[in-house]
């Protein structure tokens, strides 16, 4: 783990804060784009995701890595629980500064002062209750914060916002991803072998120019990348013209 001087960190923060101030709360981006879920301080896995080579590139040509050419959306939770939170946040902030139009960095609950203070260096996992059938939203008594939601709530939210798919993070999934509510909601979790204790895969979602969705799975310890092409029903296809993302993910149910 490298060390950072106070001057380096303050300079990095000042530069990225100025960029964030200039951006709208509701960010819009056109595909193709890669969506990354929770990282939680797992720096090596973050680097591995960013260093994937462009799929269309000739094997004999000079490697062109995705971190400098692709568009990325991060759903938050870059820090806490892992051992290299500082490295992770410094890397994504540096990429935002170098490629401001290619990176959208959303704020997860672990990017709030209270949560960061509480979980910064502790190992903690929480098992939530099963999602109920009724009512659509109820208080999450198991975790003591936020709410639980069901399929009816997802359908109503999509109808009100006129959207076809909600992509969220904030929850470990054994396969790295999971669809819900007839594929109108997908949870993405990008930290394989979470906290070096759970035998889960990591995943990222890729949205092609035509709106087609694929999921890249990263396993641990061999870190083999495997592509699953998910054929979405026509009414579940993403609008390929633009994607809208909230910069304050804490307003979403989790």
From Swiss-Prot:
Gene Ontology molecular function: protein serine/threonine phosphatase activity
PROSITE patterns from the UniProt entry: SER_THR_PHOSPHATASE
Gene3D superfamilies listed in its UniProt record: 3.60.21.10
InterPro entries per record: Calcineurin-like_PHP_ApaH (IPR004843), Metallo-depent_PP-like (IPR029052), PP1_catalytic_subunit (IPR050341), Ser/Thr-sp_prot-phosphatase (IPR006186)
Record-level GO cellular component terms: cytoplasm; nucleus
Name of this chain's protein: Uncharacterized protein F44B9.9
